[in-house]
């Protein structure tokens, strides 16, 4: 038994499973997905056991839309004796590469949170036992693989490992952010998470600097505009609804009560285009790609609202529209990242810019 374990938002297991099967086939790795609805977990069982390690190294987490975390698993330890849960877990880790960190985790769900205290409690003796067997280094080392023990419940654990170059450094693969009280809506967290995920830290000072000009399509009441203003940008907020008064009082926002699909910026100095309009994903994708292809902006972050069924297929259709639009305008190569963020719901967030 060997394969890839992947975390996702509860309810999106089928979408992640479809995506993983397709991506694995592109790497000539074959198997089948195993999932339970609303578990937040997908197990891709490899037909060839050695392929699990290959996937952990070569299937980039950053390219998976619906996955929050991934690791190669070797065993599912079931019906663990409450008097000795650690023994079977150790046996499942014997052939792991030397690991520099242990993560004991659970699902991001009501059931998962019920065992979070148990996971914290067992972490200390489990870490000591792994170090005693030299599976884990005496001190944490971030350059070595991570040992994962994922508890489905208090008597069932999946054991595996991931590589530091291809995993999420966040607990459960979740970047948790604090809602700023002065922000006009919770949607502000989506753009904040997108900026932190898509823009490397060493480049944020330049690409998210004060003084840049931005356009926010579908801006009201101003959740996304808030993130731009907070960073010192000047924003054209496009929407027929009402904007937050505090944002308007900053002097950094020009309100444009117009249709986002028809809006044209006054000047050719827009760096960022952001968009969280509730519209068909195909329409939004074409609009965003047109702005990028015609160089009306340099970078864009936008959301694609998804249908209840065939969400992965809907995303692929939208991305194909983007590719066709860029090709039609002969705009050249471009960088594209897509992720189902923690703060997203029935939507995914896209970052895009020309590769100059």
UniProtKB/Swiss-Prot annotation:
It is found in: Cytoplasm. GO terms for molecular function: S-adenosylmethionine-dependent methyltransferase activity. One of its GO terms (cellular component) is cytoplasm. The active site is at 305 (proton acceptor). It is an enzyme of class 2 (transferase). S-adenosyl-L-methionine binds at residues 187, 220-223, 239, 259, 276. It catalyses: cytidine(2498) in 23S rRNA + S-adenosyl-L-methionine = 2'-O-methylcytidine(2498) in 23S rRNA + S-adenosyl-L-homocysteine + H(+). Keywords: Cytoplasm, Methyltransferase, rRNA processing, S-adenosyl-L-methionine, Transferase. Its EC number is 2.1.1.186. GO terms for biological process: methylation; rRNA processing. InterPro entries: RlmM_FDX (IPR040739), RlmM_THUMP-like (IPR048646), RNA_MeTrfase_FtsJ_dom (IPR002877), rRNA_MeTrfase_M (IPR011224), SAM-dependent_MTases_sf (IPR029063). Belongs to the class I-like SAM-binding methyltransferase superfamily. RNA methyltransferase RlmE family. RlmM subfamily. NCBIfam families: PRK11760.1 (NF008734). PANTHER family: RIBOSOMAL RNA LARGE SUBUNIT METHYLTRANSFERASE M, RIBOSOMAL RNA METHYLTRANSFERASE FTSJ DOMAIN-CONTAINING PROTEIN. Monomer. HAMAP family: 23SrRNA_methyltr_M. Catalyzes the 2'-O-methylation at nucleotide C2498 in 23S rRNA. This is Ribosomal RNA large subunit methyltransferase M. It comes from Pseudoalteromonas atlantica (strain T6c / ATCC BAA-1087). The gene is rlmM.
């Amino acid at each position: 038994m060997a394969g890839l374990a992947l975390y996702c938002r509860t309810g999106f297991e089928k979408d992640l499973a479809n995506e993983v099967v397709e991506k694995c086939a592109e790497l000539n790795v074959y198997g089948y997905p195993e999932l339970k609805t609303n578990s937040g977990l997908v197990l891709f069982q490899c037909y060839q056991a050695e392929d699990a390690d290959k996937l952990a190294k070569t299937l980039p987490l950053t390219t998976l839309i619906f996955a929050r975390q991934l690791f190669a698993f070797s065993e599912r330890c079931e019906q663990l004796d409450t008097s000795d849960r650690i023994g079977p877990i150790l046996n499942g880790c014997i052939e792991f590469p030397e690991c520099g960190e242990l993560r004991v985790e659970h699902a991001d769900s009501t059931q998962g949170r019920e065992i979070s205290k148990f996971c914290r409690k067992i972490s200390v003796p489990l870490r000591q036992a792994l170090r005693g067997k030299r599976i884990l280094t005496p001190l944490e080392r971030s350059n070595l693989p991570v040992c994962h023990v994922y508890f489905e419940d208090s008597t069932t654990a999946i054991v595996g490992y991931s590589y530091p170059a291809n995993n999420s450094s966040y607990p459960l693969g979740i970047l948790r952010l604090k809602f700023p009280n002065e922000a006009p809506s919770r949607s502000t967290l989506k753009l904040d998470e997108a900026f932190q995920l898509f823009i490397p830290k060493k480049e944020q000072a330049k690409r998210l600097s004060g003084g840049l000009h931005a356009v926010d399509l579908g801006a009201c009441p101003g959740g996304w505009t808030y993130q731009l203003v907070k960073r010192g940008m000047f924003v054209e907020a496009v929407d027929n609804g009402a904007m937050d008064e505090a944002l308007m009082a900053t002097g950094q926002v020009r309100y444009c009560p117009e249709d986002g699909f028809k809006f044209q910026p006054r000047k050719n100095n827009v760096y960022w285009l952001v968009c969280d309009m509730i519209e068909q994903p195909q329409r939004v994708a074409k609009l965003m790609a047109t702005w990028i292809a015609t160089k009306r902006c340099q970078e864009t972050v936008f959301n694609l609202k998804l249908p209840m069924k065939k969400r992965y297929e809907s995303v692929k259709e939208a991305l194909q529209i983007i590719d066709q639009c860029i090709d039609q305008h002969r705009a050249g190569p471009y960088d594209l990242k897509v992720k189902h963020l923690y703060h997203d719901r029935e939507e995914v967030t896209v970052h895009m810019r020309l590769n100059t």
